[in-house]
């Protein structure tokens, strides 16, 4: 069977149209989880970020701004960064786990009930959380070196959550299998990743440039948009993985 990016995109749009209520619900829940956790554990750090944004012209970079802070303020900012990363990690894991499980159940024509919103075993959720944390750290290290290494790791690791949940492999085996499959199907996977990344950058620029909403609402809308486009990418990658020849998955 010949697989093309256009055919996968059409399948993705068709699935999105037929299952959009549940997909939107997952997006709303994951965005709410991220924003609520962030607002609970990082309420005092926003004043530092707001101060930096107001006087951004005084500083050449965020590092220059950090050097002007007291030790306590630096600790607070570090805590805020870790907490924000944690909230994003939890929200992303919730979205990935539930959406992949839902698509898998739909593909096997299983009955969908309200339990789908809490259908992931805790061990599987924690395992997926570890996988996303590991791949995120490696990707961020890649971006610290240069854009190309970071972007390449995003592509190579893109199928690992799907493989982890469907094949029930270990974290390292899921990453290894994802790398092998993406290298063999670069032309199919890369366009979707580029579209997803460009959309994320576009949304971040739009929301950061236009100050129509409060910081809380703007952050929620940002997460909402990013999670929605991420859902489309997950559907695309899931469909891609399922129709690949079996010998490529081993």
Swiss-Prot record:
It is a multi-pass membrane protein. The keyword Metal-binding does not apply. Keywords: Cell membrane, Membrane, Transmembrane, Transmembrane helix. One of its GO terms (cellular component) is plasma membrane. It is found in: Cell membrane. The chain crosses the membrane at residues 21-41, 86-106, 125-145, 146-166, 188-208, 216-236. Pfam families: UPF0259. Its main location: membrane. The keyword Calcium does not apply. Belongs to the UPF0259 family. NCBIfam families: PRK02868.1. This is UPF0259 membrane protein bbp_256. It comes from Buchnera aphidicola subsp. Baizongia pistaciae (strain Bp).
